């Protein structure tokens, strides 16, 4: 099973790396695409891209192949989500833009959010506590299981959108559909 997650993330990474202009979706903190094995307990159960995914000449670019334990932030996200939604084993973070949220809603995706300014001090002061708290809040704020979770940032925290799915290839396909619509909206029809 371990090889399956690595191969799935590798294939997803190839898809987004070959998508022209995918770099316009990459946030300042960079992206990562993750996939957890069933019932993940910690980052060692989650495949990610070491060093994250950056933008180079408009495209998504990764310096290394996916491996287990290569992410902490996105690993904590998918572990927290998977506790409530065991079928969701993969996620990709992209930059926040109101028009991307509108695109997701127009596509019929379930979108939820959380407000980082409402994060309790006890959570903020706990190393690694913010992400699980945010996932819990987004789940509470949604009547249906969300496909997309976002926040508008906070002091020193970049706003972010996270796409979720059953596996990394599904999430990459979704991201590429969003990219096409976003480029069209921005007047780029390449």
Swiss-Prot record:
Pathway: Cofactor biosynthesis; thiamine diphosphate biosynthesis; thiamine phosphate from 4-amino-2-methyl-5-diphosphomethylpyrimidine and 4-methyl-5-(2-phosphoethyl)-thiazole: step 1/1
Pfam families per record: ThiN (PF10120)
EC number: 2.5.1.3
Keyword Transferase found: yes
Catalytic reactions on record: 2-[(2R,5Z)-2-carboxy-4-methylthiazol-5(2H)-ylidene]ethyl phosphate + 4-amino-2-methyl-5-(diphosphooxymethyl)pyrimidine + 2 H(+) = thiamine phosphate + CO2 + diphosphate; 2-(2-carboxy-4-methylthiazol-5-yl)ethyl phosphate + 4-amino-2-methyl-5-(diphosphooxymethyl)pyrimidine + 2 H(+) = thiamine phosphate + CO2 + diphosphate; 4-methyl-5-(2-phosphooxyethyl)-thiazole + 4-amino-2-methyl-5-(diphosphooxymethyl)pyrimidine + H(+) = thiamine phosphate + diphosphate
InterPro entries assigned to the protein according to its UniProt record, in alphabetical order: Aldolase_II/adducin_N_sf, ThiN
Any Gene Ontology biological process: thiamine biosynthetic process
EC category name: transferase
Keyword Transcription regulation part of the UniProt annotation: no
Name of the protein: Thiamine-phosphate synthase ThiN
Organism: Methanothermobacter thermautotrophicus (strain ATCC 29096 / DSM 1053 / JCM 10044 / NBRC 100330 / Delta H)
């Amino acid at each position: 099973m371990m090889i399956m997650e690595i191969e799935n993330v590798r294939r997803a990474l190839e898809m987004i790396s070959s998508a022209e202009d995918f770099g316009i979706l990459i946030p300042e903190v960079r992206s990562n695409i993750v996939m957890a094995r069933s019932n993940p307990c910690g980052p060692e159960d989650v495949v990610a891209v070491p060093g994250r995914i950056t933008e180079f000449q408009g495209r998504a670019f990764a310096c290394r192949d996916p491996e287990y334990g290569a992410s902490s932030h996105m690993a904590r996200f998918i572990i927290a989500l998977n506790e409530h939604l065991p079928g969701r084993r993969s996620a990709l973070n992209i930059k926040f833009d109101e028009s991307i949220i509108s695109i997701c809603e127009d596509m019929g995706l379930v979108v939820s959010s959380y407000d980082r300014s409402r994060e309790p001090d006890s959570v903020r002061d706990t190393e690694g506590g913010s992400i699980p708290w945010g996932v819990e809040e987004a789940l509470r704020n949604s009547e249906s299981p969300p496909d997309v979770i976002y926040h508008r940032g906070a002091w020193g925290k970049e706003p972010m959108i996270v796409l979720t799915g059953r596996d990394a290839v599904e999430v990459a396909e979704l991201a590429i559909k969003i990219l096409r619509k976003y480029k069209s909206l921005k007047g780029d029809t390449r």
